[in-house]
Amino acid sequence: MVGGGVKSAERETCMPGEAVLQLNQVSITGRSKRDSLFEQSLEARAHEILGIAGVSGNGQAALASLIAGLEVPENGSILIDGSTVEKPTPKKMIGAGVGRIPEDRNHEGIIGKMNLADNLIIEKLDDTEIQNFGILKQGKIKTSAADLCATYDVRGPGVDAEARLFSGGNIQKMILARVFEQNPKLILANQPTRGLDMGASAEVRRRLLDARKNGAAILLISEDLDEVLALSDRILVIHDGNLIPAETRDRAQIGLLMAGTAA
């Protein structure tokens, strides 16, 4: 999506820090080259939003799966804070400080028939704050969930209700609460405002910019070029499984890169 109009986000100037995420010559072979990555490298730094712009189906899913630990690279390496993540898994990536806002919030972001409170702690079940020798502290979990719902303005039938009963915007705010409360070093934001109304979209963007200000590295994957231009410090275009640096913020030139027709 190249048009559409995104309200300008207040993106303050930040000095980029050290590299948080490094991909070095990684490859994943999918069903076609549009589902793959071919010896690609990138670096995302603290206090920075790295935007990945592209038309749907050009390797975004492969890139997101790699960083989430859902795929193991066939070659190359993944580093978080300079340390190689061997045979990445979702648990390893979370442990390394990666927070994930998935593309499909309803199927990848929540367990629909699980209540909201339990969805909020699903990624930290080893934390002794919420469990003791494997027994969950339900009172603590519900109190924490109520506090997070107030902080992130999650509205709906309550923390004991199944997550699937909440609206899309409130599910996304619940996911934001789960991610940001862990103070991740790296945030994978994959189509974070897709399908949201203007108010919910603005809130998501504000939270991403706050995380950037506070030192996180953010990898923003979006098909909305307006969003990428508004939020990103640097932009890479993904096309046919290849990452191409955008040397300009000119919409027309980036659009040509997205279409694979740039000179």
Task: Name each region found by the language model.
Residues M1-A263:
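Glycine-rich phosphate-binding loops of nucleotide-dependent enzymes
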